């Protein structure tokens, strides 16, 4: 699909400088732009590429002034980076604008779905499932009984949603995600064997949540495991039974959160963080990668290390840690002097 500079400017509320009929059919980085591509410039570090790019159209900030002739048509907007992000989203919507029901697939007679459904081949929809409008369900997705899904939700290939799970609107769930599998609940017996504790709760995913590939979110033992509105989860995260993730909290890959821990709003959690169970983590907390959390955390704390301590304390301690060989050498020299009298 092709767009002219004028059409793009209308979408972005921008102003064209150059050829208004310049056509583009793809997006590219400014240093790799070719004829027919659209790119953007927002970081001054890349300004030199504007004068060498072969891109047909380039989005720039409205206060940008060229210092020499350019071969690309400019579209001036208030915020070039944000405008390009808008186009990426628009492009993605066009690319993913599938509809219809492919065969073979299965929809239970008691299931209900809204307009604009796309159901890929070998997908399965169980009994009493409710699906909203404009939902895209890609091949090999499994949706168990009594699941409810809102509007404008995308489930990429291979997603598994166990029974009773509730998914809001504007949610994106990437390939390989498992929602609602049993939590890790086992009761030790007197002779060392384990008995399984039935997990009869569910999972609730609120609106505007994004879940990365391979992430697993276990159902609650009782009640609900909850991912609040706007949370962003990276790939390969393990969220255990009865965990609650607060609104607009972002968690990087390979983090594991043990059962019944509550995490507040607007937290940032780095990759490979381990969080013990039954903890309360406040709002706006920042946890650096590979940290180990074993205690409750107050609002606005910044932590690093395993076990995690305050970020500034960690940096001070690390300086001393790096100097340990030198410090030990000094101590040995002093010991020799003392022992030799």
Swiss-Prot record:
Q: Name one GO biological process term.
A: lipid A biosynthetic process
Citing just one GO molecular function, the answer is: N-acyltransferase activity
- Pathway it works in: Bacterial outer membrane biogenesis; LPS lipid A biosynthesis
Q: Does the keyword Cell inner membrane apply?
A: no
| First and last residue of the signal peptide | none
Catalytic activity as recorded in UniProt:
a UDP-3-O-[(3R)-3-hydroxyacyl]-alpha-D-glucosamine + a (3R)-hydroxyacyl-[ACP] = a UDP-2-N,3-O-bis[(3R)-3-hydroxyacyl]-alpha-D-glucosamine + holo-[ACP] + H(+)
Classification via InterPro entries: Hexapep, Hexapep_transf_CS, LpxD, Trimer_LpxA-like_sf, UDP_GlcNAc_AcTrfase_non-rep
Gene Ontology CC terms: membrane
**Under which EC number(s) is this enzyme classified?**
2.3.1.191
Cite the entry's keywords alphabetically: Acyltransferase, Lipid A biosynthesis, Lipid biosynthesis, Lipid metabolism, Repeat, Transferase
**What is the active site of this protein?**
241
What interactions and quaternary structure are annotated?
Homotrimer.
As for family, the record states: Belongs to the transferase hexapeptide repeat family. LpxD subfamily.
Functional summary from the UniProt entry: Catalyzes the N-acylation of UDP-3-O-acylglucosamine using 3-hydroxyacyl-ACP as the acyl donor. Is involved in the biosynthesis of lipid A, a phosphorylated glycolipid that anchors the lipopolysaccharide to the outer membrane of the cell.
Any idea what this protein is called? UDP-3-O-acylglucosamine N-acyltransferase
GN (gene name): lpxD
């Amino acid at each position: 699909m092709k767009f002219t500079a004028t059409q793009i400017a209308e979408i972005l509320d921008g102003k064209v400088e150059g050829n208004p009929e310049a056509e583009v059919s793809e997006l590219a980085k400014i240093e790799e732009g070719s004829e027919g591509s659209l790119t953007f410039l927002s970081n001054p570090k890349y300004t030199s590429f504007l004068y060498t790019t072969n891109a047909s159209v380039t989005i720039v900030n409205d206060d940008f002034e060229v210092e020499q002739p350019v071969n690309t048509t400019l579209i001036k907007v208030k915020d070039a980076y944000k405008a390009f992000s808008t186009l990426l989203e628009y492009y993605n919507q066009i690319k993913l604008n599938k509809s219809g029901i492919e065969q073979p697939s299965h929809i239970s007679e008691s299931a209900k779905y809204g307009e604009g459904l796309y159901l890929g081949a070998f997908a399965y929809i169980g009994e009493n499932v409710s699906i909203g409008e404009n939902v895209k369900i890609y091949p090999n997705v499994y949706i168990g009984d009594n699941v409810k899904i809102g509007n404008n939700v995308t489930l990429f290939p291979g997603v598994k949603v166990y029974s009773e799970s509730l998914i809001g609107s504007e949610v994106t769930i990437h390939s390989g995600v498992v929602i609602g599998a049993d939590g890790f609940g086992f009761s030790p017996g007197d002779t060392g064997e384990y008995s399984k504790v039935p997990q009869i709760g569910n999972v609730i995913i609120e609106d505007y949540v994004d879940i990365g590939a391979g992430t697993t979110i276990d159902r609650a033992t009782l009640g609900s495991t909850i991912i609040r509105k706007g949370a962003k989860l990276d790939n390969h995260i393990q969220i255990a039974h009865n965990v609650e993730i607060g609104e607009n909290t972002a968690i990087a890959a390979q983090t594991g959160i043990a059962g019944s821990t509550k995490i507040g709003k607007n937290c940032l959690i780095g990759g490979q963080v381990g969080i013990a169970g039954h903890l309360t983590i406040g709002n706006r907390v920042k946890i650096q990668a590979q940290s180990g959390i074993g205690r409750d955390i107050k609002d606005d704390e910044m932590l690093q290390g395993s076990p995690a301590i305050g970020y500034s304390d960690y940096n001070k301690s690390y300086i001393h840690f790096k100097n340990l060989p030198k410090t030990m050498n000094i101590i040995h020299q002093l010991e020799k002097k003392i022992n030799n009298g």
